[in-house]
């Protein structure tokens, strides 16, 4: 919590006056503190705790022994089945979330072997999207593998985060459904570089970081050239807070014009947030 105060100020001083936080439960409180003038930082739209399936990317008990881990459920953001999905969304709303994040596939930095497999059924995601809509919230989906992305897009999520291994079918679905793509090239570059350092990541994480990280820039090129809607995002916390602007350089290096990159962080990002009038 104390570090989040420092990170908020660094982000604001880096020139970012509004941010979307995907998966840090402490940041619903940080948001309130900023709004009350107690803390210096950007305007925050927070997803609260990211939702996961058991053993999924955002399961808070990954890597723990069963005796210590217990059996987390919707209150802890872990869902199995449609009823759990509904309850978990309502819990995040109760906790102060502005939107919902799901981890539709495995991830790079979680203590789990697979970083690509789908981790929700389409029915579960449909219920999450439907329930979020009841509370005037939308859903963002962390996803690396193509199948998990396709399920999430068909179910109606508003954005795909990372999208590392998206294929041509995924791109066409995104265009059909109007799904936003948030590439987070910064995170890919960061983990790919750190994966070269012996011992920097746990043994189960290092191969994922080395494989998935370097691919994000090429995925961005493919999506951009195909006309997918792209919104700026960094996954800061993986890369360093306050260095958000590096993403502009990566996007431009991958083929986007400077003005398009700025547009992705302003107009397009505001549309993704539903704040284009503000």
Q: Could you tell me what each predicted segment is?
A:
Residues 150-170, 250-261:
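Structural recognition of alpha->loop->beta junctions
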Residues 1-137, 170-172, 177-198:
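Divalent-metal coordination cores built from histidine and acidic residues
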Residues 30-33, 57-58, 149-155, 248:
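Distinct, well-ordered alpha-helical segments
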Residues 88, 147-148, 169-170, 219:
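Short acidic active-site motifs
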Residues 49, 143, 234-236:
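Active-site metal-binding loops of divalent metal-dependent hydrolases
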């Amino acid at each position: 919590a104390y570090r989040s105060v420092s990170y908020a100020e660094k982000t604001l001083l880096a020139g970012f006056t509004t941010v979307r936080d995907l998966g840090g439960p402490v940041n619903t409180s940080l948001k309130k503190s900023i709004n009350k003038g107690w803390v210096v930082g950007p305007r925050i739209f927070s997803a609260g705790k990211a939702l996961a399936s058991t053993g999924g990317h955002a399961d808070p008990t990954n890597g723990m022994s069963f005796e210590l881990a217990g059996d987390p459920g919707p209150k802890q953001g872990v869902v199995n089945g449609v009823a759990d999905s509904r309850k978990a969304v309502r819990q995040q709303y109760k906790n102060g979330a502005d939107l919902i994040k799901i981890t539709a596939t495995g991830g790079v930095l979680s203590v789990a072997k697979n970083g690509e497999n789908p981790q929700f059924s389409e029915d579960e995601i449909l219920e999450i999207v439907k329930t979020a809509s009841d509370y005037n919230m939308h859903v963002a989906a962390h996803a690396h593998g193509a199948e998990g992305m396709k399920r999430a897009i068909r179910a109606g999520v508003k954005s795909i985060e990372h999208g590392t291994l998206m294929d041509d079918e995924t791109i066409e679905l995104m265009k059909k459904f109007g799904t936003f793509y948030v590439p987070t090239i910064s995170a890919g570059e960061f983990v790919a570089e750190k994966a070269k350092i012996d011992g920097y990541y746990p043994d189960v994480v290092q191969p994922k970081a080395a494989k998935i990280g370097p691919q994000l820039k090429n995925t961005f090129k493919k999506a951009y050239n195909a006309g997918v809607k792209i919104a700026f995002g960094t996954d800061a916390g993986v890369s360093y807070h306050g260095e958000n602007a590096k993403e502009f350089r990566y996007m431009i290096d991958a083929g986007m014009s400077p003005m398009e990159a700025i547009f992705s962080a302003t107009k397009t990002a505001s549309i993704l947030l539903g704040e284009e009038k503000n």
